[in-house]
């Protein structure tokens, strides 16, 4: 579980463990009180390991799901502001997510993000062995990180051992997710080199930082969901990748932020301006808050579209070969429709 990166970490983890075991995993992000039991019921005697994702958006949801899962190991990716509308504070989110750590017994392993400030408190709540993994801290770390549109390469550090690894997606936050998966693999006896093979071959759930090229224009499709933390991470990835042309961000609304909604959207716009995005298009009323904040922070080319179709029309007019365009928003914002409309307009190209 975690505020961000649950599904990608699950995919990496299943692939890493699949180097040694017959693995079943949650399909997509079917991770709630209906999805988790259904996934478990679909497990057969052929499977040796299950990798199950647990989600929540209200208090009291993780503990009963953790009891159903009865995990031998647990991963908590991070604590952010996703679902803060229903939880109130990050501290409340940490308390809720930490229920998964409490469900692991003394023979098990709890894997935490060494770079997340809430991990120290969560670690105190479990009887299990705690393993910390992070880009900058922990017993598993990453160094010599290189990124391109086709993915990331980095060196895994574990004590005195080093191993080069590759991911099919870019983004430092994806490297972090991968390290958590490697920690799970090591906890189950998978060799470090085999963990790296698992990362390189992991089939990832769609719309998570996928590169799609349409007539020379590259789209960074991260449209599945969004919150302020994941938006900022995606914007950083956009700016870290090489592009022959401009870097453009097309951003939709972020749901379930409650009282933090206005400020959360403003922070994303301010981050886009600070990073030096060439152009930003915000979609809808809340997307307009993003673009307005970006313009106020100094990003001159910051526009608002009333709908995904209007955003697509703007891109059709301005996009040129070599441009790299980030597409991101909450699930209900359907920002992926921008890519489909752009593809249809550009000579019926297929995505």
Q: Where are each of the predicted segments found?
A:
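Conserved RecA-like helicase motor-core motifs
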Residues: 21-28, 133-134, 300-303
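Acidic, Mg2+-coordinating active-site environments of NTP-dependent enzymes
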Residues: 73-219, 244-245, 270-273, 277-279, ...
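ATP-dependent carboxylate/acyl-activation modules
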Residues: 206-208, 335-340, 349-351
